[in-house]
Swiss-Prot record:
Classification of source organism: Eukaryota, Metazoa, Chordata, Craniata, Vertebrata
Phosphoserine modified-residue sites: 333, 335-336, 347, 356, 547, 578, 638, 670, 682
Gene: FTSJ3
A Pfam family per the record: Spb1_C
Keywords: Citrullination, Coiled coil, Isopeptide bond, Methyltransferase, Nucleus, Phosphoprotein, Ribosome biogenesis, rRNA processing, S-adenosyl-L-methionine, Transferase, Ubl conjugation
Coiled-coil annotated residue ranges, if any: 356-404, 733-771
HAMAP family: RNA_methyltr_E (MF_01547), RNA_methyltr_E_SPB1 (MF_03163)
GO biological process: maturation of 5.8S rRNA from tricistronic rRNA transcript (SSU-rRNA, 5.8S rRNA, LSU-rRNA); maturation of LSU-rRNA from tricistronic rRNA transcript (SSU-rRNA, 5.8S rRNA, LSU-rRNA); RNA methylation
A GO cellular-component term linked to this record: nucleoplasm
Purpose: RNA 2'-O-methyltransferase involved in the processing of the 34S pre-rRNA to 18S rRNA and in 40S ribosomal subunit formation.
GO molecular function: RNA 2'-O-methyltransferase activity; rRNA (guanine) methyltransferase activity; rRNA (uridine-2'-O-)-methyltransferase activity
Positions of region (Disordered): 332-366, 454-482, 579-654, 805-841
Extent of the signal sequence: none
Protein name: pre-rRNA 2'-O-ribose RNA methyltransferase FTSJ3
Length: 841
């Protein structure tokens, strides 16, 4: 015999438990919550009537979502436990007594919402139960029509049966919007659905037959349609082909394609385009691909059709241009023919045409005069508007006491001969101070010219003569040095241009009150005095680190500068590079060697660029330094002169060895025989030549665990190196140690400042002891010194002790009692959380 399942417990779903947790009296409360979330009918309601309200879950939801001063009435056959701000009645909604009781409670009020979640006692047969529920819904609708206000809502539960459609038709006659829905809280196996009726029409008179079950649920005989009625008598007209179109293949000409108003529609109907015009066929746009596409348009894709449209556009432009040229030629020929005919005409015809020409000239002259008058009037209006606008501005300035009455706006501009505002740069200032030198220029132009200016073109000619005198190798060397020299000149000219631009931006007539370096330092101090840099400013160690980093960077850069000349051959230093270094050195000093010349150039560049903006100097350093670094870091390179520059080899990077590697290294370093034996033993039966990735990972891991040869290392040595490795791992990294030291230093500094403030508070005489304690507590709290974590002592409880545990002997402060059960519960909770995470993934 089969075992019957527990029906009651299986129906306890998540909404059942949610109702228990939130305090609702039934799980059906969530149905109303979901309906209200979708249709929003409770927030605006001021009065509500709940029919079949027991046990009161829907009343609880209504009291929660409706305004506080709302009127809520609940009716049911069974008594309902009292709820705050809710009136409950124990009546039968199908009787007249219930209607009288509701009128007594509501008085003259009309409700905005009527709810009905009622259902009869079920269990006899499904047909009887469905009819009883439909009858109960009809009675609820009758009450709703009596007490519902215009535009109100009626929400009811209905069973899906054959009486559902008649009910829906009655709802549609009385309400503006009727929607049937099934909320998520309603069980899937349940036959209930909820009908939301909104916008009550409130008719003056409702036919009583609507609420009569015999009439409302009366079966209507539907006449069956015969076969002749189902078959359509007239055959519909076939669509898809044009009338009179007997063929599906349409051949058109290219001229029709060019004249088509809608080319896309033309291509959809055409099958082939014939290029019948010889001139269009010879056009450059008519390629072989276009000819192939024109042969069968129905098989073309989007790309080919777009190419045909572009081809049509080009041809239309060509044809339009050709027609314009023909029209111009025709006009010229016609004008020449008319002149000939005019010469051959009689004098009488000329006399008849003269009056007409004179009339045209007179009319044209009058039109020109009218246009000139209109332009003059417009110009006068424009000047008048401008004058009025200036007067209005002047009047406003006088009213605001910005100007004197006798001063006009026209006097504001500097129209004098000596205007200081026009001087915007150093060059203009020099021109003003020098005066007019045009006379001197004319005097110098009259003098005979002894000096000869050699242009760049003549220099190029000298270069060509030099090329003929030198060997190819010497010529290559000279050209290389010349290129380097030109690069240096370009950089120096760029720096000078930047200087000139800065001088032009600054007004030379304005004398700065402070020097530029002092002004830049004050601007930097003003920037770093903001609140966001307060913590950085207080930390002395941060400034120390920055200064140390700058010193280290300078020393490394000087070292690189000193290493570069050492790597060059001696002949490269003395013979070839000495002219270059002499060019780079300052004019007032002479370089004794190539290295001194290079350092001299560096110093000159630094001094020259220090006055310029910091960003430009940093960009120059960044653009020069990496070039030198790249030349050193890469392999040996041969310069244009044929000399090989030997790079400085960086030391090899050390590998980080594990304890096993350290022990093997000690064995290898101890004796050559042990090293040789170790190498020989590395070729054994456990050694294979598989590539990485050929074997599965689980197989490789298993081989490493079970098929490995023991190394000739003792346990003591391995333990020694493991201990040493653990000590190394226990040390904090440099950054962590520095951060901890900085944190400790900040805390000590903060503690010292707080101690000084506390001494000042203690020495104050004007305040009481209680105020002193409060101020000291606030000082230590702001300093972050009173935020010590409370120490918790864990006490393991024994079995049979019970819930109340006394403080054990020797335990001070806060303590917590734990047991093995709590540990197991925590582990179970962690396992559940892990399972939930895996399910979400």
């Amino acid at each position: 015999m089969g075992k019957k399942g527990k029906v009651g417990k299986s129906r306890r779903d998540k909404f059942y438990h949610l109702a228990k947790e939130t305090g609702y009296r039934s799980r059906s409360a969530f149905k109303l919550i979901q309906l209200n979330r979708r249709f929003q009918f409770l927030q605006k309601a001021r009065a509500l009537l709940d029919l079949c309200a027991a046990p009161g879950g829907w009343l609880q939801v209504a009291a929660k979502f409706m305004p506080v001063s709302s009127l809520i009435v609940g009716v049911d056959l069974v008594p309902i436990k009292p709820l705050p701000n809710v009136v409950t009645l124990q009546e039968d909604i199908t009787t007249e007594r219930c209607r009288q009781a509701l009128r007594k409670e509501l008085k003259t009020w009309k409700v905005d919402v009527v709810l009905n979640d009622g259902a009869p006692n079920v269990g006899a047969s499904w047909v009887h139960d469905a009819y009883s529920q439909a009858h109960l819904t009809l009675m609820a609708l009758r009450l709703a029509c009596d007490f519902l206000a215009r535009g109100g809502s009626f929400i009811t539960k209905v069973f899906r049966s054959r009486d559902y459609q008649p009910l829906l038709w009655i709802f549609q006659q009385l309400f503006r919007r009727v929607q049937a829905t099934k909320p998520q809280a309603s069980r899937h196996e349940s036959a209930e659905i909820f009908v939301v009726c909104q916008g009550f029409l409130a008719p003056d008179k409702v036919d009583s037959k609507f609420f009569d079950p015999k009439f409302a649920f009366k079966e209507v005989e539907v006449q069956a349609k015969t076969v002749t009625e189902l078959v359509t008598k007239k055959k519909p007209k076939a669509e898809g082909y044009a009338e009179g179109d007997l063929t599906l293949y349409h051949r058109t000409s290219v001229t029709d394609f060019l004249r088509a108003a809608n080319p896309v529609d033309f291509l959809s109907k055409a099958s082939e385009i014939m290029v019948d015009d010889e001139e269009l066929a010879q056009h450059p746009a008519t390629t072989e691909d276009i000819r192939v596409c024109c042969q069968d348009i129905r098989v073309l894709g989007r790309k080919e059709l777009r190419s045909l449209l572009n081809w049509r556009t080009k041809l239309r432009r060509y044809v339009a241009k050709k027609l314009k040229e023909q029209a111009k030629a025709l006009d010229i020929s016609l004008s020449s023919g008319e002149e000939d005919e005019g010469n051959e005409e009689d004098s009488t015809a000329g006399t008849t045409e003269q009056p007409s020409k004179e009339e045209e000239e007179e009319e044209q002259l009058n039109q020109t005069l009218a246009e000139m008058k209109a332009q003059e009037v417009a110009e006068l209006k424009r000047k008048k508007k401008k004058l009025l606008r200036e007067q209005r501005k002047q009047r406003e300035r006088v009213e605001l006491k910005m100007d004197l009455p006798g001063v006009s706006i026209a006097d504001e501009g500097e129209t004098g001969m000596f205007s200081l505002r026009t001087i915007r740069g150093q060059q203009l200032l020099e021109e003003v101070t020098q005066g007019d030198m045009s006379a001197a220029d004319t005097f110098l132009s009259d003098l005979p010219r002894d000096d000869i200016y050699v242009s760049d073109v003549e220099d190029d000619g000298d270069d060509t003569s030099l090329d003929s005198d030198l060997d190819p190798e010497e010529l290559a060397g000279v050209r290389g040095h010349q290129g380097l020299r030109d690069q240096k000149r370009v950089r120096l000219t760029e720096v000078q241009d930047d200087k000139e631009e800065e001088e032009e931006e600054e007004n030379p007539l304005l004398v700065p009150l402070e020097e530029k370096a002092v002004l830049q330092e004050e601007q930097a101090n003003l920037w770093f005095s903001k609140g966001s840099f307060a913590g950085i400013e207080d930390d002395a160690d941060e400034a120390l680190e920055i200064s140390q980093a700058q010193l280290l960077f300078e020393s490394q850069r000087k070292g690189r500068q000193q290493q570069l000349p050492q790597t060059l051959p001696s002949c490269l230093k003395t013979e070839i590079m000495s002219p270059l270094y002499q060019d780079e050195a300052p004019k007032g000093t002479e370089a004794s060697s190539g290295t001194e010349a290079a350092t001299g150039l560096k110093g000159e560049e630094k001094d020259g660029i220090s006055d310029s903006d910091s960003s430009s100097s940093s960009e120059e350093e960044e653009s020069w330094e990496p070039v030198r670094g790249k030349k050193r870091s890469r392999g040996p390179k041969s310069d244009d002169d044929g000399f090989e520059i030997v790079p400085i080899e960086d030391p090899a990077k050390h590998r980080i060895l594990d304890p096993e590697g350290l022990a093997l290294g000690a064995v290898i370093a101890s004796s050559k025989k042990a090293k040789r034996d170790l190498i020989d033993n590395s070729f054994n039966r456990y050694t294979f030549n598989e590539d990485e990735g050929e074997l599965p990972e689980w197989f490789v891991q298993e081989e490493k665990q079970h098929r490995i040869r023991q190394l000739p290392i003792g346990k003591k040595e391995m333990e020694h190196y493991r201990k040493r490795w653990r000590e190394i791992n226990a040390r904090p990294i440099k950054k962590v140690a520095e951060a901890k030291a900085r944190k400790k230093r900040r805390m000590l500094k903060r503690l010292e400042q707080t101690r000084k403030k506390a001494e000042a508070v203690v020495n104050t005489v004007d305040i009481s002891e209680r105020e002193k304690v409060a101020q000291l507590r606030s000082l230590y709290k702001k300093a972050g010194l009173g935020k010590e974590k409370r120490h918790v002592t864990y006490v393991v409880a024994k079995k049979g002790v019970g819930r109340k545990v006394r403080r054990p002997a020797g335990v001070r402060g806060h303590f917590k009692v734990v047991d093995s059960r709590m540990k197991k519960d925590q582990r179970a909770q962690q396992r559940k959380e892990q399972k939930k995470k895996h399910k979400r993934k």
